[in-house]
Amino acid sequence: MGNRALRYRIYPNTAQMEQILKTVGSCRFVYNDALTAKESAYKESKTVLTAHDLIRRLPELKKQYPWLKEADSIALQQSLRHLGTAYANFFNPKLHAKRPKYKTKRKSRWSYTTVMTNNNIRIGENHIILPKLGRVKAVISREIPEGWNLKSTTVCVERDYSVYVSCLFEYADISVSYIPDPALSIGLDYKSDGLYVDSSGRCCGSPKYFRKAQKRLTKAQRGLRHKKYGSRNYRKQNQRVARIHRHTANQRRDFLHKESVMIAKSYDIVCIENLDMTAIAKRDSGLGKASLDNGWGMFVSFLEYKLRDRGKLLIRTDRYFASSQTCSCCMNINPKVKDLKVRKWTCPTCGAVHDRDINAATNIKREGLRILSAIELDKVS
């Protein structure tokens, strides 16, 4: 079974918007209360409270705080399950997740998740029916494929008070009888001041949407600084700032979707490096903002599921593979070109002249095909 989410814009009326914000606040309160209870129980008696233990505390908590009854009960339970997942991720050494912390109204995401039970969530042509909200006007921008079963929905309020619903569907995996052709393979080398350079020499530059919006954003944030916090004018100006951020994020997401679908349609095997983007963004190279603006991680996630749906392959090479230092002609390793400032170099062994990025992409492609061959040999043996 596979999972896929579809995101729709909804337009709640005043009463529905008030109910959404109440539910978001209630989920935040329950989450913080459970975090306190969980930490206290462990400190006092070394007892580990599970998500199920925390959910059993909800009836008592509702008696103590009657306003919690106004929120969707399933959403409150889901917030406690999210806390359990956060702790599981924290104790998983492979994920390197941070310790769960308290949610705040100013910094935390305004969202809640509710689960499909007894057909309580329904999607129509121009509306969505949600628990505690009823019929909400929506823009159903994409039809639901046959055989997709709705599992849950997440209602998210952006900082400019636009509201979206992410609907999670479950569907049966259909085995695609497609054999990837190694001749239709390509290597992609990450480019900090762009997006990538491929093994054919094509350079995909980043539109740098955040940098283009920075002047307007600075002006809007400067106006926010002169408003009294909590006032009506402060909220209006804060929405202007949030709209700029949302527009920039939407532009970036749209560009990455188009770029990833173009590659997924054109190639059968795509080889990339398994990069630690957090470390790259923090590196003292002056390219931290550019690395975050180009959205490489989002691009890879889009590319991965688009290739998988078509029966194609995404292969990751080891992050310590010397793709830039290896001559793609004679395979000699030249450690002198490890410095990122060296953009063009000549191989001291065979005399081949290389562009740093194209050479790296070619080596990534070759290494990816080698990994694929090794996997196929293991299957045969």
Model-derived features: positions:
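Nucleic-acid substrate recognition interfaces
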Residues: M1-S381
